Regions:
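Conserved beta-strand hairpin/beta-sheet module of binuclear metal-dependent hydrolase folds
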Residues: 66-113, 197-213
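C-terminal catalytic histidine-bearing segment of alpha/beta-hydrolase fold enzymes
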Residues: 2-63
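Active-site-proximal loop/helix segments of hydrolase catalytic cores
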Residues: 189-226, 231-232
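Active-site HxH/HxHxD metal-binding segment of metal-dependent hydrolases
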Residues: 102-178, 214
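Core dinuclear metal-dependent hydrolase active-site scaffold
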Residues: 173-199
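Active-site neighborhood of phospho(di)ester-bond hydrolases with catalytic His/Asp-centered motifs
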Residues: 97-101, 118-129, 140-144, 187-190, ...
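Accessory terminal helices/loops
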Residues: 63-65, 232-319
């Protein structure tokens, strides 16, 4: 069945699919012929009959598009179609891209449109929605504790040919020097063995990855008791002078909601960090029980909340 589509609807559909290069402008009848000597309907008719033009128009997609927002001078927020959050931090000598997202585009090329500085990569943890494009960098920063997860990324995206030799291992207390801006590393293993957060005291930002908006039902998640102890170490670090009033910036904007759609807006924060420690303690003490959650990885998953904190877990990590 063929459905007739007017030009306005065609342009609207193309823009909804992510094509920012197609525009619709309506002029009074006869205006274009009088002013420019062209008949617009003839132009569109020709375009609709041009197979190459149609292929170009309808191959436009949001999957390879990125949106960027300047959070403050020197820090950009970048988002792909999958609600994956990336951040670009500028120093005097170079810039650091934190995570690569899952989009079909080229996050390195996009980052290079935002800064004139050389761009390096730091990965919060080795999940495909955070490091699909690590192969675009000659070397990158990541905890080598997550290397066993790299084959899972490459099973889904064989073009990712990153090797262990390309990984610059990062540990608790390390710092990545961008020139006048130091990005500090804090290990918060739980979601994965090598999960880290990055602290930028210059711009007052804490990049949390998936350390607080938390799935603990995934393969290789650590015991909840280990995760809690790592959170306590992070709490102690953030209690030191110079670590107050940091903006918590997560790996996905949906982390700012609850476990289920429609729950209240709850951004990552010092309060959520405190509540997550309490939630871990309640789970370990048997004082909190989750409800079945639809996304699992071969073992039943449960979702549980306490104040501003929420977690999806499996019973095998409840120890």
């Amino acid at each position: 069945m063929q459905v007739g589509v007017g030009t306005r609807m065609a342009v609207s559909s193309l823009r909804s699919a992510g094509n920012r290069d197609v525009h619709y402008t309506e002029y009074p009848a006869g205006y274009m012929e009088k002013e420019w000597g062209v008949h617009p309907h003839g132009s569109w008719t020709a375009a609709y009959r041009d197979a190459a033009a149609l292929e170009w128009m309808f191959s436009r997609t949001r999957r390879d598009r990125y949106e960027a927002e300047m959070l403050c001078p020197g820090v950009f927020y970048i988002e792909d179609f999958n609600d994956d959050s990336m951040y670009l931090v500028e120093g005097r000598d170079k810039a650091l891209l934190i995570d690569t997202g899952l989009g079909d585009g080229d996050p390195l090329a996009f980052a290079q449109t935002l800064t004139a500085l050389p761009v390096e990569l730091a990965v919060t943890h080795a999940h495909l929605d955070h490091m699909r494009h690590s192969h675009r960098f000659a070397r990158f920063y990541m905890s080598k504790k997550d290397l066993p997860l790299l084959p899972r990324v490459q099973d889904s995206f064989p073009e990712n040919t990153s090797t262990a030799e390309q990984v610059i291992d990062i540990r608790d207390g390390d710092a990545i020097d961008l020139g006048g801006v130091a990005i500090e590393v804090a290990e918060v293993g739980g979601h994965t063995p090598g999960s880290v957060v990055f602290i930028d005291r210059t711009h007052k930002c804490l990049f949390t990855g998936d350390a607080l908006g938390l799935w603990m039902q995934v393969p290789m998640a650590l015991p909840i008791s280990t995760y809690r102890d790592n959170l306590l170490r992070l709490q102690a670090k953030l209690a030191q002078p110079g670590y107050t009033e940091l903006a918590f910036l997560g790996g996905h904007r949906r982390q700012e909601g609850g476990v289920h759609p429609g729950e209240p807006y709850v951004p990552n924060s010092y309060e959520k960090l405190e509540d997550m420690v309490a939630l871990c303690n309640k789970l370990l003490a048997g004082e909190a029980e989750g409800e079945p959650y639809p996304v699992d990885f071969g073992e039943p998953a449960f979702a549980v909340s306490y104040k501003t904190a929420n977690m999806v877990y499996k019973e095998s990590v409840r120890c």
